C-alpha cells in the first residue's frame, strides 16, 4: 500500500541514448562541426519500478523504470512534489526526499537518508545510510554513512561553513 498524489508518472523510459555507430559521444562531438549531423539513438527500458509498503509519492514526481533491472523505492520512503528518480536508482527504507530533488541513473541511496529541497545527485553514486544532504547540495562523489553534507560541490557541513566564513573574510584581506 502506498499513497500516490496527482500527476505522478511511474515507469517512464529512462533518459538513455547512444550514438548511432556506438562510438564515444565526446569523440563524436569532436569529429562533427554541425549539430544537425549528430544522431542519438534511444535505449529502450525493459526494467520495472518496485515500490515498497508505506511509500508516499508527491504530485508531479517522475520515477523512470530501470533500463534492464528495476528502479526500487523501499518501504517507508516519502517523496515530496516534483522529484525525479532516474532509471536503475535504488532508494533505501525510510528516506525523506524533499521537493525538486533529482537523482541521476544507477545511484544507490541507503536507509534513513534525508535530502533537502533541490538536491542534485550525479549518476552511479552511493549515498550512505543515515546521511543528510542539505537543500541545494550538489553531489558528485559518493557520500559515506552518517555524514551531513552541504554545498556545491558537496562537502561535510563543518568544512562548508569554514569555507564560507573564509570567503566572507576575503574583502578584509589586504
Task: Enumerate the predicted regions with their spans.
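Structural signal for interior beta-strand "rungs" in well-ordered beta-sheet cores
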Residues: 2-23, 27, 31-156
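Long, leucine- and charge-enriched amphipathic alpha-helices
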Residues: 155-174
Amino acid at each position: 500500500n502506498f499513497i500516490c498524489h496527482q500527476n505522478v508518472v511511474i515507469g517512464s523510459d529512462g533518459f538513455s541514448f547512444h550514438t548511432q555507430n556506438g562510438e564515444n559521444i565526446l569523440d563524436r562531438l569532436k569529429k562533427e562541426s554541425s549539430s544537425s549531423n549528430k544522431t542519438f539513438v534511444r535505449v529502450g527500458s525493459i526494467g520495472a519500478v518496485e515500490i515498497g509498503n508505506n511509500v508516499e509519492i508527491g504530485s508531479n514526481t517522475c520515477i523512470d523504470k530501470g533500463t534492464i533491472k528495476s528502479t526500487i523505492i523501499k518501504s517507508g520512503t516519502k517523496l515530496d512534489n516534483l522529484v525525479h528518480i532516474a532509471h536503475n536508482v535504488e532508494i533505501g527504507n525510510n528516506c525523506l526526499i524533499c521537493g525538486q530533488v533529482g537523482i541521476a541513473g544507477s545511484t544507490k541511496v541507503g536507509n534513513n537518508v534525508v535530502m533537502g529541497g533541490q538536491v542534485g545527485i550525479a549518476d552511479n553514486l552511493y549515498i550512505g545510510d543515515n546521511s543528510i544532504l542539505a537543500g541545494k547540495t550538489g553531489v558528485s562523489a559518493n557520500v559515506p554513512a552518517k555524514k551531513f553534507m552541504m554545498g556545491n560541490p558537496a562537502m561535510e557541513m563543518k568544512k562548508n561553513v569554514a569555507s564560507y566564513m573564509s570567503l566572507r573574510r576575503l574583502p578584509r584581506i589586504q
